[in-house]
UniProtKB/Swiss-Prot annotation:
ATP binds at residue 122. Residues 82-381 form the Protein kinase domain. Keywords: ATP-binding, Kinase, Nucleotide-binding, Serine/threonine-protein kinase, Transferase. This is Protein kinase ORF16. The active site is at 226 (proton acceptor).
Length: 387
């Protein structure tokens, strides 16, 4: 293995004994003493370890906050590291130190290439996805991600590779991570159990920016395909909201040449997330009406707008839509009061925002608010309340 970055040209001996007594692995104000991370010292240079120890983050108040901000279920083992390294090559790890992982296919860690200092490497078997019609040879996921990044609507995609193998292909990406995983994580609970009260004015401005970005992408024939709060993040305190996970990105007609077979374009079905799909969504039939497609995006934005202020996934994604009742506003206000999700605000601003949510979440597409009107109404709220 050769390296010109953080990785050692020749790995050292993994010394689990004494790892804890030696202070473990230092990440900013945090010392990780689990011996399962001893391999990091063996594979990464002193320069990399010193960089990791000197990391800072505006949300780190103590060592306990470091791991609280980093997603993942468990620490990355040497076995998992070597397995992914053999798949994607050292280039991915020369500027990325993985610490946590999910199902051995998504690694979360730290990178000097990221504006937040944090990054995520995703390496999965390729069972879905096509090439961008507007950029031959470039996966639609990459094309959409980079176009979104250019307009400030996505974190930076640092590296990607399509790995061809015997009978199966894999796709790997390395990208900036948000300050605290997804938007839900960012506005969710702290270790103390307390919610992070949100500034409603800031929420309105961030949603306005998101709607504008989605409109620009759709004007470029790019549809995200899986809009939900889990696929949004923030890379700066307070916002803006940025899109992540472009796996289902597609052009309007959803016709793309597959990445896994050497054949012509096919029409893809867009599964998305069932609980977040609009009522009119048909998993078996691609949408052929641009207005209907846009109204589906409006529905998904309504769910995002709702969940951002109530912080209650079960309520928002209830398949029976129990929240969609005549006393909708009273129900939402009660949940918000119980969750303590909003900082003190002008009740008239909340009233106007809830009105927009209600308009976005009308089941009848004939009366559901369209994207242009939503953009206009959000602009009026920003102007009226001097946000």
């Amino acid at each position: 293995m050769t390296s010109s970055g953080f990785l050692r040209a020749h790995p050292g001996v993994v010394r689990r004994c004494g790892f804890t007594r030696g202070g473990g692995l230092k990440v900013g104000p945090c010392a990780l003493t689990d011996p399962g991370l001893a391999w990091v010292h063996a594979y990464y240079t002193d320069e990399a370890l010193n960089w990791l120890a000197g990391l800072d983050n505006p949300l780190w108040k103590s060592g306990a906050d470091v791991m609280d901000l980093l997603p993942g279920d468990m620490y990355v083992s040497e076995h998992v590291f070597k397995k992914i390294l053999s798949r994607v090559g050292p280039e991915f790890f020369d500027s990325f130190i993985p610490i946590r992982e999910v199902e051995e296919c998504i690694l979360f860690g730290f990178s000097p290439l990221s504006s937040t200092g944090m990054a995520a490497l995703k390496a999965i078997d390729l069972v879905y996805g096509g090439y961008a019609p507007a950029a031959p040879g470039i996966p639609m996921e990459v094309y959409a991600w980079e176009m979104a990044y250019k307009i400030g609507a996505a974190p930076r995609l640092l590296r990607w590779v399509l790995i061809e193998g015997e009978g199966i292909e894999q796709f790997a990406t390395l990208a900036e991570s948000g300050l605290r995983g997804s938007l839900r994580d960012y506005i969710g609970t702290h270790p103390s159990g307390c919610k992070t009260p949100m500034d409603l004015g800031l929420v309105v401005k961030n949603v306005h920016g998101l709607v504008a970005a989605l409109g620009m992408l759709m004007d470029s024939n790019i549809y995200h395909g899986d809009l939900k709060i889990d696929n949004l993040t923030v890379t700066e305190p307070g916002g803006p909201y940025k899109l992540i996970d472009f796996e289902f990105a597609h052009p309007f007609e959803a016709r793309m040449r597959p990445m896994i077979e050497a054949r012509g374009p096919i029409t893809w079905l867009m599964p998305g997330t069932p609980a977040c799909n609009p009522p009119e969504h048909d998993e078996e039939t691609p949408c052929r009406d641009r207005r209907m497609k846009e109204l589906g995006v409006t529905w998904q934005l309504g769910l995002i707008m709702l969940e951002t202020i109530v912080l209650d996934e079960a309520l928002v994604r209830d398949e029976n839509m129990e929240w969609k009742r005549p006393d909708f506003k009273r129900l939402v206000s009660a949940v918000m009061e119980e969750n303590g999700s909003l900082a003190p605000h002008d009740p008239r601003l909340l009233e106007g925002y809830l009105d927009l949510i209600g308009e976005c979440l009308k089941r009848d597409t004939a009366v559901r608010m369209d994207l242009v009107t939503l953009m206009t109404e959000l602009s009026l709220l920003i102007e009226k309340f001097k946000l």
